[in-house]
């Protein structure tokens, strides 16, 4: 699944990166996460100003902290392959059991820097492109899904607009249910202001804050649920999606 996602992102013009598992708390705060507190989703390292990352968004966004980019460099599209660590504070109930919510998983994350403008033209176009790529990934896997345009009241602090992809998971709930597998957000200049990331247009005075966007390509645990539950057969075997057969080396996984 990682190689499948990474291959598509490389073809889409993303620079592939392997990101660290630790980040400075000032970067977490700049991205919009709270590294301390009773309801935090972050694992902090005692007696340090470091925390385990919950997503590569944190380290990818922090790559250009306190820098001024040239407009000609934009957009910058990065893909991070990382471990993700989350406390999952407050998670409970049957729907969260198994590997749907876990404390550590691997994820391929998209992150983009675009020019900032009052109409959000560049970042809005990029958001639609990130959504297109997420749909392309799950179309390629043959997984049924739906797109949710997140209501304003459900947006977190950093996000100006956010889409979720929910995949059909036959084993979820009593008779199957939709489960979130990706999300993509346009944070406009929220993160850039806090991290001090600007850009300069040639021939113009002054600088402007960039806009930042993030999006899940594939979160391994949840994508695996969707693949296994949609492709499992009556005899217990699992048909391997055609897009993955080159890496799996077979077209069906049989029970032992």
Task: Enumerate the predicted regions with their spans.
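TRNA-recognition modules of translation machinery and tRNA-sensing kinases, especially anticodon-binding
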Residues: 2-256
């Amino acid at each position: 699944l990682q190689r499948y996602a990474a291959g598509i992102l490389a073809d889409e013009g993303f620079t592939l990166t392997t990101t660290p598992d630790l980040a400075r708390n000032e970067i977490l705060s700049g991205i919009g996460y709270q590294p301390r507190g009773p309801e935090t989703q972050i694992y902090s390292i005692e007696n340090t100003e470091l925390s385990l990352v919950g997503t590569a968004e944190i380290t990818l966004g922090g790559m250009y902290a306190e820098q001024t980019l040239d407009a000609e460099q934009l957009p910058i599209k990065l893909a991070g392959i990382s471990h993700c660590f989350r406390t999952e504070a407050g998670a409970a109930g049957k729907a969260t059991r198994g590997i749907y919510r876990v404390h550590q998983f691997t994820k391929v994350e998209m992150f983009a820097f675009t020019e900032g403008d009052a109409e959000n033209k560049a970042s809005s176009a990029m958001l639609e492109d990130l959504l297109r790529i997420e749909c392309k990934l799950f179309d390629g896997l043959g997984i049924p899904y739906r797109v949710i345009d997140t209501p304003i009241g459900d947006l977190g602090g950093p996000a100006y607009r956010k889409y979720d992809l929910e995949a059909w998971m036959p084993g979820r709930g009593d008779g199957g249910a939709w489960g979130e597998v990706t999300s993509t957000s346009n944070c406009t200049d929220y993160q850039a202001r806090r991290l001090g990331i600007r850009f300069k247009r040639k021939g113009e005075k002054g600088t402007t804050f960039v806009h930042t966007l993030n999006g899940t390509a594939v979160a391994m645990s949840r994508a695996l649920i969707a693949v296994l539950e949609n492709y499992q057969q009556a005899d217990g075997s699992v048909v391997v999606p055609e897009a993955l057969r080159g890496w799996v080396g077979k077209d069906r996984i049989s029970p032992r």
